[in-house]
Each structure stands twice: as structure tokens, then as C-alpha cells.
Regions:
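Short, solvent-exposed amphipathic alpha-helical segments in soluble enzyme
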Residues: 18-22, 101, 206-208, 299
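Short beta-strand-to-turn element immediately C-terminal to the catalytic PLP-Schiff-base lysine
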Residues: 16-19, 87, 176-178, 320
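Gly/serine-rich nucleotide phosphate-binding loop at the start of the catalytic core
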Residues: 2-54
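Active-site microenvironments in enzyme catalytic cores
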Residues: 6, 43-242
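Surface loops and adjacent helix of pleckstrin homology
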Residues: 29, 96, 309
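Catalytic-pocket segment enriched in acidic/His residues
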Residues: 7-12, 191-193, 197-332
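Structural motif
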Residues: 22-23, 172, 312
């Protein structure tokens, strides 16, 4: 089942669901919001599908028309945007067979002291990212991106700050979670995401990684309820006007990863800070495909498009650059 949120004519949230790509979406009767439905399921010991079924479905919704009209909202929002957390992890994907062979060769043949920190982290994932049942795997790279104020709706612009040196896409899968009143994390499902980052800043010094990730992100338009397919294959492209300036396949799913989703989830939610009742988490799981690696420099007005057939409509966002702001701290 695919679930999304749409802005109604009076500013209300309309929750839309459909069984899969190609099916007609329908509004959930008195849905309220995906957050409201998910919290009812989490706190009531029910599945999200059963909560939706109990509400019933109403009018049909043309999602392509909604997209064209710019009425998609992020597929989950929180009544208080500060309680939606955007986070991510990286160095989790094997990439293509050639990339995998190359990285294996580098990590197995090179002396430990000659490996970069990134390569060491990748090697740790290869060796310990998929633990046996009942065991804990190695912890991955982790970073903070922001909160709900940094969540750009599908179809909206990803706004790069004026001081940024780059604004580039990262096509990823994101896990979508709510925290029940007893502190238990519940996964709604997975969505396409663009973990928009400043790769030039990151490249200056890896200690700038934290700075480079403090950028908006977008996810959706639809959440695929349930577990993720083992082998996820999609396409990432960038359009400049009528021209496609970058297009490349990207892979995800555990068949193409050095970690299990469960291991990555554990190392996020093991922190009590991230199990505050009522909070929402959007956790992005990394990628092996970047236009930056191909020498592409996106410009204002370019459109990022990420698509995977099983996850519904593609995720599209344009690139915009914010005007310079004067920021000065004042003494009270």
C-alpha cells in the first residue's frame, strides 16, 4: 500500500492511499493526517492498514494532477515541526559489481594504516554490518540533517543556503517512523528521498561532513507501507530545462548494502533521545550514486528526479539558492 498527503482547498490535510503503482488513489475518510493514523495504530496495537480500513475510503484522487498543481505535502508531517527528525547514515551501499570489487580489493590488500577513515568505515560494514540473529552489528556513520522545518515537499524547491559551495542530490531510501506513547519505535514503511548535501564542503575536510549535511531534504511523494524489497533498482536524473544532464541507475535494498536495515535502525534508536513518545523520524540509508562523482555541478532551476517503480510517483525537486542573510547575535 502507498500512502501520501495532499493539501486540501481549505488548507487541510487529505490522506490518500492506493494499493500500488498504477492503481487509483482514494482519500481516507476523516484521515486527519498520516501522523494521526500512524499514532493511532502504534498506541492501539493495530496495523496501519487496519486503521485505514476502519476509516474507509472516499473520493478518487488524481495524484498526477495533484503533483502538477503543487499540492503534495511531505508524506508525513508533525503538528510541531521541531518533533520531526531528519537524520541519515552513509557508507552503507556496495554499489555496482565493479565498485564492490574495487573497494574489496582496496580494503583487503591495503595496509590498515593506509586506509582512509571512510574506507575503514566501509570495511567495518562489510565485516560486521549484517549480524546474525540476536547479535548486534557494527555501528555505521551517522549524521543529523535537521527537523521538520527542513523537510521540502515533493515538487517544492530544495533551497541551498547562500554560503553553500555546492547543492547536490543523494538518491536514497528513507525509513519513516513514529514513536508510540510507551517509547517503542514503529516503522510505517519506506520512501524515496533526496538527502540533499554540499559535497564540495564535505570534500575540503571530512570533519566538515556535519556542516555539509545541514541542508533541506525531501522524501516521498508516497510511503510504501511495510518492509522494503531486498533488491531496489531505480534511476536518478537531473534535468536542466528540456535537457537531461545526468541520468544513472541507483541500487538499494539489503542485497546491495553492507548493512541490514535492522542494524541501521538499531544504531539510531538505541539512543533514548530518539525514542521520545510522539516524535517522527525520517532516517535516510545512504547511496552509491551521486552526480557529483561524475563532475556535475547543479545550477539553480535544475530539477532532481528520483524514481523506483515500486515506490509510486517519482520524487521531483528543483534547486534554488537562498539570498544572503546577515546573521548577528545580540546581547540581552
Amino acid at each position: 500500500m502507498l500512502i501520501s498527503q495532499i493539501k486540501g482547498s481549505n488548507g487541510e490535510i487529505i490522506v490518500a492511499v492506493r494499493n500500488g503503482p498504477g492503481d487509483i488513489a482514494k482519500a481516507v475518510v476523516n484521515g486527519g493526517s498520516v501522523y494521526k493514523l500512524a499514532m493511532e495504530a502504534a498506541d492501539g496495537g493495530k496495523s496501519l492498514a487496519s486503521v485505514i480500513e476502519a476509516r474507509g475510503l472516499g473520493e478518487a484522487i488524481d495524484l498526477e494532477k495533484v503533483y502538477a498543481e503543487g499540492r503534495f505535502l511531505p508524506p508525513i508531517t508533525h503538528p510541531d515541526a521541531a518533533h520531526l527528525h531528519l537524520t541519515g547514515t552513509g557508507l552503507t551501499h556496495l554499489g555496482s559489481a565493479a565498485t564492490r570489487d574495487s573497494m574489496h580489493k582496496k580494503t583487503t590488500e591495503a595496509a590498515e594504516e593506509t586506509l582512509t577513515d571512510s574506507m575503514k568505515m566501509f570495511k567495518m560494514g562489510i565485516e560486521g554490518g549484517k549480524p546474525k540473529e540476536g547479535e548486534k552489528g557494527v555501528q555505521p556513520e551517522w549524521f543529523y540533517k535537521g527537523n521538520g522545518y527542513g523537510a521540502a515537499a515533493p515538487g517544492a524547491a530544495l533551497v541551498s543556503p547562500s554560503f553553500a559551495l555546492d547543492g547536490g542530490e543523494e538518491p536514497e531510501m528513507a525509513g519513516i517512523y513514529v514513536i508510540a506513547k510507551d517509547g517503542t519505535p514503529f516503522r510505517i514503511g519506506f520512501a524515496l528521498s533526496n538527502e540533499f548535501s554540499d559535497h564540495v564542503t564535505e570534500r575540503i575536510n571530512y570533519l566538515y561532513l556535519a556542516h555539509s549535511k545541514l541542508r533541506p531534504a525531501s522524501f516521498g511523494p508516497e510511503i510504501r507501507i511495510g518492509t522494503a524489497p531486498d533488491d531496489i533498482r531505480g534511476t536518478s536524473r537531473i534535468k536542466r530545462g528540456d535537457k537531461v544532464i545526468f541520468e544513472k541507475p541507483f541500487l538499494s535494498g539489503e542485497a546491495n548494502m553492507s548493512h541490514t536495515f535492522a542494524n541501521l535502525e538499531y544504531h539510531h534508536f538505541k539512543y533514548g533521545l530518539f525514542r521520545a513518545p510522539g516524535d517522527v523520524h525520517v532516517h535516510m540509508f545512504g547511496t552509491a550514486t551521486l552526480s557529483f562523482a561524475e563532475g556535475i555541478k547543479p545550477e539553480a532551476g535544475d530539477v532532481f528526479e528520483i524514481e523506483v517503480a515500486e515506490f509510486g510517483l517519482p520524487l521531483r525537486n528543483s534547486l534554488a539558492v537562498a539570498a544572503e542573510e546577515t546573521v548577528a547575535v545580540r546581547q540581552l
